[in-house]
Amino acid sequence: MQLNPSEISELIKSRISGLGADAEVRNTGTVISVTDGICRVHGLSGVMQGEMLEFPGNTFGLALNLERDSVGAVVLGDYEHISEGDTVKCTGRILEVPVGKELLGRVVNTLGQPIDGKGPINAKETDVIEKVAPGVIARQSVSQPVQTGLKSIDSMVPIGRGQRELIIGDRQTGKTAVAVDAIINQKGKGIFCVYVAIGQKASTIANVVRKLEEHGAMEYTVVVAAAASDSAAMQYLAAYAGCTMGEYFRDRGEDALIVYDDLTKQAWAYRQVSLLLRRPPGREAYPGDVFYLHSRLLERAARVNEEYVENFTKGAVKGKTGSLTALPIIETQAGDVSAFVPTNVISITDGQIFLETDLFNAGIRPAINAGISVSRVGGAAQTKVVKNLSGGIRTDLAQYRELAAFAQFASDLDDATRKQLERGRRVTELLKQAQYQPQQVWQLAASLFAANNGFLDNVEVKDILPFEKGLHDHLKTKYADLVNRIEETKVLSKEDEPALRAAIEDFRKSAAF
């Protein structure tokens, strides 16, 4: 067989012309070790801090430690299939989660993936989980209220839109109950809610979701769940993912409320991740930047001005301010608020609601300690009618608790002291409230008005709550115009005051109290 040189050259030319030279330039590295969800990766010279890394099996990780000859990364999800020598690729993207109204009514994990079995979420947008908080110029002062529906909070420690109000207390003192009641009370008030569950039992999270569904609150709520069975990295990042979902509404001129339940477990998860990454431990074995962990998260809750919203939406939304209100929860050990994480978060937030085990066990629920609980900016946002009527309530309660402690040892008390103790008992009883029964502004106003004007003085302590319920029913059926006026205007005018007094006196005559 004789080969023709021209045929050979033609064959070679055709092969060369058909050669596909498609090449993907990716920064890659090799897994050196895998332990407890932490991977050490050699290579990845151009990786960014916080960048998503792609592991085999469609698994992603997060680059946290950038060292001279290796990268320390946390794996987001299962890591059992990752082994030494596996190839790791850079993605060139910071960790993002889906955002938007498509998430409302759904339960998602830290990465925004649905875990409620209701099918995929067709979110149109995604956003990075780590963002810089709005600057000083972009912010506006807190001046609009967030009604929690809880008498003791709305009267003594009011919360405003854009505020950070800490809920702090030992385990089993009703911290989650306060936050869930606040979410339920936002129905019809135009506030979107995000509930972030960190390190809780899956059964506990399921109970909260079921209660929100029963009260129709899931229509305007997103639940971000990082259960106790999830990895430490997922628990640590859940709060930031939830915050990004809440910021979507804030930046578009809407109002949102976010509950972090709870940041103690987030700090534990971050401590675990940091120690596994071999970062040097500090006080209570927490890393040096544990304050920054919470401050950069809570500073993102703010009320932003009209100009910020207009610039963000490129003029699509004008004349509207946006807000993200945060209710972080901290669990204390044996009432120790001077521990590392509680003191950090107290110093970052705009006030705290302190829940006490002794009060809870005594049947005073919500178990709010009126002496230590404070709202630093909420007073400006409180509704006028409640502000005018609740002035003396907090002082009365604080003085009553002090006097009650002394009265245990004193046998003969003067009339003034006895009167103050009696009033304190009645106010304490009045501020008790069952779970999942939030009150409207007019109900709170009527109760406070009755207490301030001595209508409860002749009512037995055990009859205070039945008296209150009867009064509300009486006002709703016979004085609907007055009730609607107070609810709409949020003011008790000089004309309405005698009308309310007459209505309560009318009820006293007809009721057997």
Curated annotation (Swiss-Prot):
Binding residues for ATP: 169-176
Domain of life, source organism: Bacteria
Membrane topology: Peripheral membrane protein
The entry's keywords: ATP synthesis, ATP-binding, Cell inner membrane, Cell membrane, CF(1), Hydrogen ion transport, Ion transport, Membrane, Nucleotide-binding, Translocase, Transport
Protein name in UniProt: ATP synthase subunit alpha
Originating gene: atpA
InterPro entries: ATP_synth_asu-like_sf, ATP_synth_asu_C, ATP_synth_asu_C_sf, ATP_synth_F1_a_nt-bd_dom, ATP_synth_F1_asu, ATPase_a/bsu_AS, ATPase_F1/V1/A1_a/bsu_N, ATPase_F1/V1/A1_a/bsu_N_sf
Site features described as Required for activity, chain residue numbers: 373
One MF term in the entry's GO annotations: proton-transporting ATP synthase activity, rotational mechanism
Top-level enzyme category: translocase
Record's subcellular location: Cell inner membrane
